[in-house]
Amino acid sequence: MRAPKFWYEPNSWKATFLLPLGYLYNLLTYLRGKTGKPLKYNCLTICVGNLNVGGTGKTPTTIALADHFLKKGLNVHIVSRGYKGKFQGTFLVNPRNHKADEVGDEPLLMSEFTSVWVSKRRKNGIAAAEKAGAQVVLL
């Protein structure tokens, strides 16, 4: 998926129209960072991605990072929200027992490479991964 052309045309009407939304997003992100309670974990935590959704390479990048850390001998776990999955709560994906409509297609794919936790709340997923011995958690 390519970035929209208007991203590179600062004087286009689309860019001008979206500019106030960009300022609002920036303000809300700043305020969230200032008012939120920082969470501390005992493992390296790396978040892959940003506002872009679908087709930007987040899953292949996550798999490549997992492979990199696995080759260094580290215990790597991935935490995913399980987009479009039916299951609730926090659980470890088992590629032999779960189906894509239950856990989401990307967690199921990534579970072929390393341990993957599905949790709508990231902090619960990270806590479960740490309890299971994760040294590196990829979000």
Residue ranges and their predicted role:
Residues Y30-R96:
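Walker A (P-loop) phosphate-binding motif
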Residues R2-T45:
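A transmembrane-helix-recognition feature enriched in membrane-embedded lipid enzymes
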Residues S80-L139:
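P-loop/Walker-type NTP enzyme "switch/lid" segment
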Residues L24, T59, M110:
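Residue-level signal for inorganic ion chemistry
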